[in-house]
């Protein structure tokens, strides 16, 4: 994942706003580019910032989330896989008693230090989704992307275009 940012004297919302820019297939990987704005400049985590509510088992441990969806019977459904490697086991779903098994690509953006009086941030984020073309063979997939700032404001959700995997 690569992050580029620049400071502008503009009035952006304190709630992050993201915009989908592009998707490129690079071998078995996919690179997605989004742009973002944040009016109060509280994007990203400082080194070691893992206390509540950003701890490893907390809901806000990750601040950039990419969820895959695959085409099933003419509708896009969220990609799932059983993942027993997590140290944080989710609670069972109340209606079924089963555990959620959602697959996602989750990241922790690095802290960006706003400079000057204007703390607003604007920039581009490049996300590399490794081995995606192998994870969903012979499928049509797309991705939903959103982010959180340190004030726990959730951005809008954007979707990529669909990609057909070999």
Predicted regions and their residues:
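C-terminal motif of bacterial Sec signal peptides marking the signal peptidase cleavage site
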Residues: 2-5
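Non-catalytic macromolecular-recognition regions in eukaryotic signaling proteins
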Residues: 7-166
């Amino acid at each position: 994942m690569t992050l580029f940012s620049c400071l502008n004297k503009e009035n952006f919302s304190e709630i992050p706003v993201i915009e989908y820019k592009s998707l490129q297939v690079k071998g078995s990987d996919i690179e997605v580019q989004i742009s973002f704005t944040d009016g109060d400049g509280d994007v990203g985590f400082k080194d070691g910032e893992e206390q509540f509510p950003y701890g490893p088992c907390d809901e806000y441990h990750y601040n950039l989330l990419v969820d895959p969806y695959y085409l099933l019977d003419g509708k896009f459904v969220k990609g799932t896989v059983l993942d027993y490697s997590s140290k944080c086991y989710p609670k069972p779903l109340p209606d079924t008693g089963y555990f959620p098994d959602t697959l996602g690509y989750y990241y922790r953006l690095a802290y960006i230090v706003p400079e000057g009086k204007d703390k607003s941030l604007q920039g581009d984020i490049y996300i590399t989704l490794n081995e995606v073309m192998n994870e969903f063979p012979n499928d049509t997939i797309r991705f939903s992307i959103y982010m959180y700032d340190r004030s726990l404001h959730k951005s809008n959700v954007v979707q990529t275009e669909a990609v057909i995997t070999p």
